[in-house]
Amino acid sequence: MTHTPPNDQTIVDEYFKLRTNRRRSRLAWLFGMIATYGLTPDALEGFSWGPEASICIQGKRRPISPVHPQWAIIFRLKEEQPRNWQDCLQSLSEQLYCAMAYQKVGVNITDLLLSHQMRKRLYRSVKRPRKVLRPLAGVS
């Protein structure tokens, strides 16, 4: 049996379901970051905000842009970032994994990452048309 990754609407709905639950509202921020940037919680450690909703990760040359830039705005990721997020990232990650294990969150991290990778490939191929091979000059 094949498993299909969640569609965009499912991800957005799950984010707002988390956001409206007072006990899980901080998890919503982490969920939104994973969905928007396609990074695991561990990879988010030490990030900083870059231009135009991108984030800069230590050890990466270029900023990481969201596949859906509107998600950074809709989810208010910059504004809703926990004040001491560096200190509580490990705790937030554990809480998110537990919530997923007990099915309090309908979309797991693996599915979010898979969905992000698929959309990234799709949008990259749409942005860059395939190169057409041209015959070499003088060759018939």
Question: Where in the sequence are the language-model features?
Answer:
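Positively charged, low-complexity intrinsically disordered regions
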Residues: T4, T10, T20, S25, ...
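Basic, Lys/Arg- and aromatic-enriched nucleic-acid-binding interface segment
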Residues: T2-P41
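Basic, alpha-helical nucleic-acid-contacting "clamp/cap" segments
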Residues: S54-M100
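Hydrophobic, Leu/Ile/Phe/Ala-enriched alpha-helical segments that form helix-helix packing faces
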Residues: F31-G38, K78, M100-Q103, R130-L133
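Short, basic (Lys/Arg/His-rich) helix/loop patches that form interaction surfaces
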Residues: Q86, S93-S140
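Generic structural signal for individual residues within well-ordered alpha-helical segments
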Residues: V12-D13, E45, L113
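Short, charged phosphate-coordinating catalytic segments
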Residues: M33-S54, I109-T110
